[in-house]
Amino acid sequence: AGLRFTDCRVPDRYRLGEVGEGLHVAMYSLGLSRLHIADSNLGMAQRMLEMSIARAKERITFGKPLVKRQAIQTMIAESGKWIYLLRSAIHDAARRYEAGEDPMTQASLCKLASIDTVKIVSDNMLEILGGIGYFEECEYGPAERLYRDCRAMWLEEGPPSVQRTTAARGLITTGGD
């Protein structure tokens, strides 16, 4: 299925780029949109980590706060690691974009990393929050909504399989940079 315009005239003031460059303009915009999704996922992951830490500080089990337990500390550190790496990747991709580089490869890599990040952080959050994390609204924030929303982000601007293909093509073309 395709879309074809025959004898369609578009005034110059409405044209987004040069004639014949429409696909390039669309693909460039798609890269920026993927970077935006990665940044949105970063924000969700950061919020989930904050909720996890707040709960772990307050919840007492067997005489001490969850935050004092090594297993919980491991989940918090793992979540923090993924968030830090994603934030660094997004900053690098944004720097490249501002330098005039094509953001498609890095944007796809950032979106892939953001999917992994929110998956890990949301699983850790639900484990730390326990049963209250499944309620629509718990006292620490919208855990259930964040969990659901981060899963929906997988599909926006292409699922992970599309991101892998796009990233691989770009990496192969540039030799890995």
Predicted regions and their residues:
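Alpha-helical interface subdomain recognition
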Residues: 2-4, 21, 28-177
